[in-house]
Amino acid sequence: MATDGASCEPDFSRASEDAAEATAEATAEAAKKEFDVDTLSKSELRMLLSVMEGELEARDLVIEALRARRKEVFIQERYGRFNLNDPFLALQRDYEAGAREKEKKPVCTNPLSILEAVMAHCRKMQERMSTQLAAAESRQKKLEMEKLQLQALEQEHKKLAARLEEERGKNKHVVLMLVKECKQLSGKVIEEAQKVEEVMAQLEEEKKRTNELEEELSTEKRRSTEMEAQMEKQLSEFDTEREQLRAKLNREEAHTTDLKEEIDKMKKMIEQLKRGNDSKPSLSLPRKVKDRRLVSVSVGTEGPVTRSVACQTDLVVESTDHVKKLPLTVPVKPSAGSPLVSASAKGNVVRPSVDRQASHGDLILSSVPTVPPPSVNKTEENGPSTGSTPDLPSSTPPLPNNTAPPAVQPPSIASQNYSQASSLHSLHSPCANASLHPGVNPRIQAVRFRFQGNANDQDQNGNTTQSPPSRDVSPTSRDNLVAKQLARNTVTQALSRFTGPQVGASARPGAPTTGDISTHPPVGRTSLKTSGVARVDRGNPPPIPPKKPGLSQTPSPPHPQLKVIMDSSRASNAGAKVDKTVASPPTSLPQGNRVINEENLPKSSSPQLPPKPSIDLTVAPAGCAVSALATSQVGAWRAETPGLNQPACSDSSLVIPTTIAFCSSINPVSASSCRPGASDSLLVTASGWSPSLTPLLMSGGPAPLAGRPTLLQQAAAQGNVTLLSMLLNEEGLDINYSCEDGHSALYSAAKNGHTDCVRLLLNAEAQVNAADKNGFTPLCAAAAQGHDKCVELLIAYRANINHAADGGQTPLYLACKNGNKECIKLLLEAGTDRSVKTRDGWTPVHAAVDTGNVDSLKLLMYHRAPACGDRLNEEEPESDVFDLDGGGERPEGTVKPVVPADLINHADREGWTAAHIAASKGFKNCLEILCQHGGLEPERNDKCNRTVHDVATDDCKHLLENLNALKIPLRISMSETQRDSFGSDDFECENTIWALTIRRQTSWDDFSKGVIQALTNHFQAISSDGWWSLEDVTFNNTTESSIGLGASSVLSIMLGSVSWSPGQSFAQSPWDFLKKNKAEQVTVLLSGPQEGCLSSVTYASMIPLPMLQNYLRLVEQYHNVIFHGPEGSLQDYIAHQLALCMKHRQMAVGFSCEIVRAEVDAAFCKEQLVDLFIRNACLIPVKQSPGNKKVIVILENLEKSSLSELLGDFLAPLENRSTESPCTFQKGNGTSECYYFHENCFLMGTIAKACLQGSDLLVQQHFRWVQLRWDGEPMQGLLQRFLRRKAVNKFRGKLSSPRDPVCKTVDWALSVWRQLNSCLARLGTPEALLGPKYFLSCPVVPGHAQATVKWMSKLWNAVIAPRVQEAILSKASVKRQPGLGQTNAKKHPSQGQQAVVKAALSILLNKAVLHGCPLPRAELDQYIAEFKGGSFPLSIVSSYSSCGKKKGENGAWRKVSTSPRKKSGRFPSPTWSKPDLSDEGIKNKTVSQLNCNRNASLSRQKCLENDLSLTLNLDQRLSLGSDDEADLVKELQSMCSSKSESDISKIADSRDDLRRFDSSRNSPAFSATVNNPRMPVSQKEVSPLSSHQTTECSNSKLKTELGVSRVKSFLPVPRSKVAQCSQNTRRSSSSSNTRQIEINNNSKDEIWNLRKNEQVEKPNK
């Protein structure tokens, strides 16, 4: 039929079109795989849009043409045989068609169906195109926005460019002006520089001239001084000769008179002889001759003018009886003078005698004192006159020190003394004075200073020889020395007469005489020495002379008249009685011995006056006052220490007036007995008297007081002891007055080295620590100038030896700076601080080295301060003082430096130590001394990173390079057990941590400190967060590091093969010991499990010691502990080391212990475990009692077996270890018996799995779980510490900066491990997580980072890539049909799964491994090919998502898929879930953790067991619509698009996992869930482990974990249980001992997504 034939044509054409469409679709599919829309440019997108529009138009035209063509063909075929002319045929056709309607097939295919099919296809294409156009349009909009922003930025750029040009123009103009000004200024600078040079040249010339003038002036001054001395000497000689001649003249006149009388007598005798009697003249002549002889030695002539008679010669034998009663009488002149008190009212010191062999100034009295009645005042007129008989000249040599002290002679033997003294009539007493007229020659006044020093040498304690000036000298011996002494006394008295007012005053009453006993009596004779004037009782008072009224503005107050006991038989020559106290002379004791005996205080009947600040002694107007120089104590030797020492003689008593109150101890001063041979001119040589002071002394009246402070300073600066003592005796004078520069009198005296002036000022209570304007004290000045005597004196008066000036200079620093060895020694013996630093950071060591003074440096380093401040015997040599002179001869190491290493290594502002200074200046000797100190650090850098060797001269460099030092490596050794259990490839058996420097002088204490410090610094360095070497941690004083290791962790130290412990000392020094034993290294052994400690385990594994101790406590306390974590987390090592430690602890207390290790595999069954427990006595029969044996069972690799099957029957007996909870086990012979676990059994297990799932959760609550998370301690920092320890070992304890390639390589390996685990956790593949064990074998090779990259490629290909591939395939197929489908998926993955695996490997490789590699990019490209998956193109990941979408996904679904998503796990078995019914949801993006109580957990477990079978049936019945491959690709896309991986701590462990259910109508439970907007479909599951970093977990609670995927479960949850769990969750508190429940993110989003899904599915119904 034609209709049939026509109907076949459309079929054929349709088939061809279908084939063409299929071909086009196949081509399009192939093109899509290679075509990436995301990578097209703007022009390419436009071209694509135009092509697509043209294609649509062409399709529309083709459709219209096909419609028209088919319509014509159909009409022709249908109605071609009919026409309108025959209606009957049409009726017949209609009839036939109606009749055969049911039988007849259609003539051709319905065009409408074809069009509908075409339109449906076009609609699909249009939808796809619309989506691409929408995406392109959005990108185009973004592009336009960016264009607008770019234009705005360009406009701003143009504006800024214009401004910049303007500013450039302005700046250019300014720069040109500045350049011109700079040129002008440079010219001016040059001119000024030339002028300055000229001025400097002139200045230099002037300086030279000034220096020449100064030299000439100094020479002239010296010449004038010499000439003046010569003139004074000549004047003194002239005066002496004049006095001698005058005395000779007087004697000759007297002799002439005698001769005249004799002539007269002879004439009379001749006359008488002429007259007759021949016998009488022969008898009278001898008698007269005898009389003449006696008269020649009798008392001198007494003229009618002179009423005061002084005994000048030996008394006549025929004297009256009153002479015997008063053997020591002093004549008095009532009309001209007043009696003078012999001693001051404040005199209280028994002064030791003076032993001066070469001086003539000691005046010795030999007299017999009488004891008057108590009512009589014991006084002397005119002082203790030396005119008493007998007299001893000063030239008499002193007795030896061992001479016995003379005894006091009673008055009964006075006649004997007089008779003995008569034999010395030829020795003239030096107290006779020639008469002087009031108008004294000024030359005599000027020479007074010269005479005073020698005249007063007679009695340093103030005794003077005075007589009335009007009395002539009686004839005595013609000795020149006596004449010279007489002349000096005459000048002194004359000057005293003319310098004082002619006013008489009485002596102060109540002042008894204190006596000092001379040690120089004549042969067999007794001599008494009267005491000197007293000293002011004012702190440490000086020996002050009697106050001269001529120097005071106010006269001394009047005193009661002195009572004098007169003899009636001799009224004109009556003298006061003198009572002298005799004391035994000190012959062997040091100076300064004082006796205070207040029991012997005499009672005075005179009225008592209060003490005054100074001593006022009235003087006779005739000039009988005590001279000021009589007590100046020139050249006196001070006592060693001010204070009370032992008395001179216990039998001697000291007379002290009761009116005197003592405030402090007094340092007695006397002439030096330690320096025999001191010259008489000590005052002149020590005082430095200047002629400029002469006019003051030449003036007759008193000087004004206004200029006295300045005069005091001048006297102290010039060393004028005379003037200084006179000034100090005045009242109202400020002795602490300082001039403009702040210099006090004490400062000036100390600076110029005037020891006597310093002593006077100190006794006068001058401020010893007064500082000038620069902060320098007198001690500083004396130490800087090198005046050791002044320094010694100031130190004795408690000067501040550590006083620092404004610049920080101490006296020790100044002494070292100027190289004053004696001052340094004195200061060090006084205990000064050697470590005081100046403002510039210099110490005394710097100062000593800077001057190159070897002796000063040796003193600083080796001189020890004495244990006691007072050296009782100064002559004994100090055995521990470093010998400065023989330092080179002493054996090295015999003297230990006293300065610490910190002081030797102290750096100044520039970072220079003393060694830097010595080396740079070429002071080789100083550098050698510094190098002898064991603590010197020659490698210390300054601020410019220069060592001592860098700045040293050639000689010093040679010295540094050849130092006597041993460099011995310090190592920490690992035990064999730790190496075997840990893996010998992972770490070296010995780690070198430092190189010890041992020198000859190193002591065992220094060696111990060095070893302990090196260990402490090493432990701190490897446990720190950054890279820093041992030099950087010396300031850290913490005893333990963050990993818990310290000095207490050391078990023993091996010096070669000899064991040594810190603090132990051998007879030999460390240098000799190590040399002798040939020790090449020092090995440290840490306390390990064998000693019941875990320190060695901590160092081997880098797990902090507190955590290991906590693990050990858990095992000992709970008995059942399981260590779990990712593979490679050292679970087996930790369990084994803890077991070893427990074993040795138990054995130490007397128990036997055994460790049983069992490796669990898939074939390990429960029966084998029962047999293991019974065989090792862990399970014992109920009837049997437990023994004392301890058993530790370690079950390794429990992840290879099912925990519920293996340990299910042991849970209750293990938790309750008693006979009350037994378990029954069947033996091999068929019988059964009850067993129980005893308390002496410990069970530890290890699981290399990050989380538990399924039925294994039932075991969880019965054990204590220790979780070893990769992102928490101890695993988080373990790899870092381990690799850092490797680097320390390679560099022998010295680490470079973080920029060093080795440090970068170690940091890269560490980041690879962290980033890899972070990415794997983000992908939801916890089974692929790696512990740090695989990375411990990372090679650390300095300078060869390629080795580390090669090692990383091997690790990637052998371990990481296979684990990642397996985990990705497991995740991609986890929701497929369990059983065969999953197995086939792993063995034969589909193309999509292979693409996902390759993409995951490529992304992990680029994001985690290659990122941060220290190699350059060009070099790194050579190694990329060695990594598996490195060549996979990432563009396929983007195109993969377009063909992976399911039907019905629209724009809304895509919006949902970009939200945070929960990754699904690979585990087929379900876990319990807890939904969140809260409307608000969880706002926090991170995981919230809530705790359920024990009841809720138990109810869940019971529900889990009841509904287990129902869950499996539901899983088989449900058709899951989500595609995990697409989800993985989304995650990979997000990871690939992120520029940098976020911090692992901020990555959420899960995202919302949204699923659609196409067959929800077949599941009533889930259709109800969908319709209920408050009930989410996908349940939130419980993660099995806690996310806390705590390692102590509860036995009875479930745990959750961050960073791992969850297991899907679709169990129908009753509302009541859900509500109960929700309420319990809200009530519970967060705790590590409760179950951790993981709640997902916002539930509102999930509900909204499900409602959208429902709307999408409605049109399909």
Swiss-Prot record:
Residue runs in coiled coils: 124-280
Record-level Gene Ontology MF annotations: protein phosphatase 2A binding
Gene Ontology cellular component list: actin cytoskeleton; cell cortex; dendritic spine; FAR/SIN/STRIPAK complex
Localization: Cytoplasm, Cell cortex; Cell projection, Dendritic spine
Biased composition (Basic and acidic residues): 1643-1661
Assembly with partners or alone: Interacts with CTTN/cortactin SH3 domain. Interacts with STRN, STRN4/zinedin and MOB4/phocein; this interactions mediate the association with the STRIPAK core complex and may regulate dendritic spine distribution of the STRIPAK complex in hippocampal neurons. Activation of glutamate receptors weakens the interaction with STRN and STRN4.
Protein name: Cortactin-binding protein 2
Gene from which this protein is expressed: CTTNBP2
